[in-house]
Amino acid sequence: MKGVLSLSLLPLLAAPSPILVDTIHRDAAPILSSHNSKEVPDSYIVVFKKNVSPASAAAHQVWVQDLHTTVMAKRSLRKRNQFPFKNDAFDGLKHTYDIAGSIMGYSGHFDEEVIEQVRRHPDVQYIEKDSEVHAWDEPVTENNAPWGLARVSHRDSLTMGTFNKYLYAANGGEGVDVYVIDTGTNIEHVDFEGRAHWGKTIPTGDDDVDGNGHGTHCSGTVAGKKYGVAKKANVYAVKVLRSNGSGTMSDVVKGVEWAAGAHLSKMVEARKKGNKAFKGSAANMSLGGGKSFTLDLAVNAAVDAGIHFAVAAGNDNADACNYSPAAAEKAVTVGASTLADERAYFSNYGKCTDIFAPGLNILSTWIGSKYAVNTISGTSMASPHVAGLLAYFLSLQPEQDSAFAVSPISPAKLKKDMIAIATKNALTDIPADTPNILAWNGGGSSNYTAIIQQGGYEATRPGNKAAQLTEKIEKLGQNTASQLGAIYSEIKDAFTI
């Protein structure tokens, strides 16, 4: 449902976002900058060409750090000689990247003189200005029950009899690792039952703790005992955002790289030992910023490595294609729906949105204690419903008698299956270019084959019921007023479902 993103340079330059920063050097690599994001001053992400080998990449990274050191020494000398110069401190090389062999590069904080030499180096395909990212959420203080779990397990709109009933397979998520790339996770929370683990902290100097709550909330929706979709899955916290809920694109890319590496290591070990207890990996990223080709490529590379990835569409009531990682075509991009089966007023939309899931007034785990909960809203809350579903469906495979140690289903196949079985046309306020698809978990079945064979489902809309009842009235003609009153009561009820 998303357009193909080519790795060639021409599409990068032709795309309206990010924009190209002009260069006076004909052969210099372009510097990309997003028009709808806040840039981090003098910070860059450098991406190598496809033909650059790991050895050449390592040599280049040594070269750029040496170049940075030399330039900084010259600046220090000018300062001692009292020549006027811009008194800035530059940190040099920050992260190096190698995401499953699909994308290599590095990030850093560099002086203009350094970055100009980097641009003219033959290894470099493009440079992207680092930018801020932030969690997609809109805090709400209302303490409602987790209706979102009930909604993804029922086909039609929730009623008084179904709004708090979640139908699920008891072992849903078992054997699956889910990387929650966010603000961290309160791994001591009782709802995780010891299945939450600290994976990696990316921001320099930050602590291994969720000081914000956003990541903990997402993790609870993925895998909590009470609040989670996949109640037996393991959660690994990958902290890329600081306690204020913001961070940098370069840190997020590094977090994606770490998750991909951890997944590949686990998968190789499982296949080597024939360990059927490990079914595979999923990931959730409920964050975003302006359009970043590098982040989109990083997510796509992680998917190619085998991670089933869910990302939030964004909360700007705008086209998701203008945001990253929402525009990463190999991930599952998730918009937010409401209890009334509407598109949430804040949810992004468009052809880059693959599916919708509950995202308004979602109750889940929180920080502050082992028992804390909170209700918040956003596509950040919708995405972990789908990440949980990815883990849930992965855990149903392979079958017990399978020769495979790890689920053989690819991320592309599972994404296709999830969309195929989803509930169609269930939501209102869906723009014409946006798929009207609501996520579904199979209604509690543990037989993946049977779930897929059911196929999709066309939701029963209140408007259709009203039309049927109107036709019924016309046929009745001259019935008594009391009979007509009863029918009109039915019409009223149909509109208020």
Curated annotation (Swiss-Prot):
Domain Inhibitor I9 as annotated: residue spans: 43-134
Gene3D superfamilies: Peptidase S8 propeptide/proteinase inhibitor I9, Peptidase S8/S53 domain
GO annotation (BP), single: proteolysis
Localisation per UniProt entry: Secreted
InterPro entries xref list: PCSK9_ProteinaseK-like (IPR034193), Peptidase_S8/S53_dom (IPR000209), Peptidase_S8/S53_dom_sf (IPR036852), Peptidase_S8_His-AS (IPR022398), Peptidase_S8_Ser-AS (IPR023828), Peptidase_S8_subtilisin-like (IPR050131), Peptidase_S8_subtilisin-rel (IPR015500), S8pro/Inhibitor_I9 (IPR010259)
Active site: 182, 214, 380
Keyword Protease: yes
Propeptide residue range(s): 17-136
Family: Belongs to the peptidase S8 family.
Protein name: Subtilisin-like protease CPC735_031240
Source organism per UniProt: Coccidioides posadasii (strain C735) (Valley fever fungus)
Lineage: Eukaryota, Fungi, Dikarya, Ascomycota, Pezizomycotina
